[in-house]
Amino acid sequence: MEYFGAIDQGTTSTRFIVFDNSGKIVEQHQEEFNQYFPDEYSVEHDPQEIWISVVNCIEAVLKKIDINHISSIGISNQRETTVAWSKSTGNPLYNAIVWQDTRTQSICDDISNNNNIKEDIKRTGLPIATYFSLSKILWLINNVPEVQSSLEKDDVIFGTVDSWLIYKLNGTFQTDVTNASRTLLFDLHSLKWNENLLNEFNIPSNSLPIIKPSLHNYGECKSILEGIPITAVLGDQQASLFGQHCFKKGEVKNTYGTGCFALTNTGDDIIYSKNGLLTTVAYQYGERNVKYAVEGSVAIAGAAVQWLRDNLNLIETSEQ
């Protein structure tokens, strides 16, 4: 029997799920991890705690199934959340700044007033907002001495959660196009980091991971799941679009999770919305076959239920 494993690393919890060839779930395990709120604007995760939750979920599943049946694994992850870690030690230099975090509004205001990069920003498909990775990277550079000194020594990697997990699994610096397209540094047309934006903000290209297609061999795991290849990586909402078989232009999916996200497959076309939708990569398989999407998002959906549970104590479980 051949199985496929999936790491689903979300905003509030992590799952490891094993599927058979028919797509049926064979086994799974889920674990929540800590949320940190330094102030009313900030939301952080401990990257090591994220990794520990992944390891715990995998180990729990491997107690019930034979690892030799798992032929490959994929990664689906919370998007935009940004991690900075040392190339030499592999240790995080600061907590991960989560997509919900709004501390970088003043940085975004400065970017908005910069007329030199308006066309380059347009090529990212995204509005200038605290939601995306660019302002988080700039905040880390400007406010964390360990990041500043590591940047000067060419010893820092800025990555989204997929990059962090790939690094922990096999020691490489890689990301996929869907996650890269959520950074405000990715060119939708060239499918590369936008050099003008990198130069404008003094972000060295070698401080960012290498961009690969969503369906790609990212190498074999060297730690837990040793020898098993990583063959797919997508941001969680794009993974949902793919998982719901929205392969045709015009097909739509909507997900209610921590937030609410509706994505429409636009096929080969890069469509810029006039009504506040985001333009993003849907998925890519092979070097050339890339599909795009437009996205509408609401930051707070299930997060409101968690707030009622954890902050107001009006309920004991989310199911209530």
What spans do the regions from the language model cover?
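N-terminal glycine/serine-rich phosphate-binding loop of ATP-dependent small-molecule kinases
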Residues: 1-94, 106, 122, 149, ...
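Active-site core segments that coordinate phosphate-bearing ligands/cofactors
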Residues: 5-6, 105, 112-126, 132-174, ...
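Glutamine-centric residue-chemistry signal
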Residues: 9, 30, 78, 100, ...
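Residue-level signal for inorganic ion chemistry
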Residues: 23, 46, 73, 101, ...
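Short beta-strand-loop/turn "lid" adjacent to the catalytic site in phosphate-handling enzymes
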Residues: 59-99, 127-133, 162, 166-187, ...
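Helix N-cap/coil-helix junction residues
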Residues: 67, 202-206, 314
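A conserved helix-loop-beta module that forms one wall/lid of the active-site cleft
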Residues: 198-216
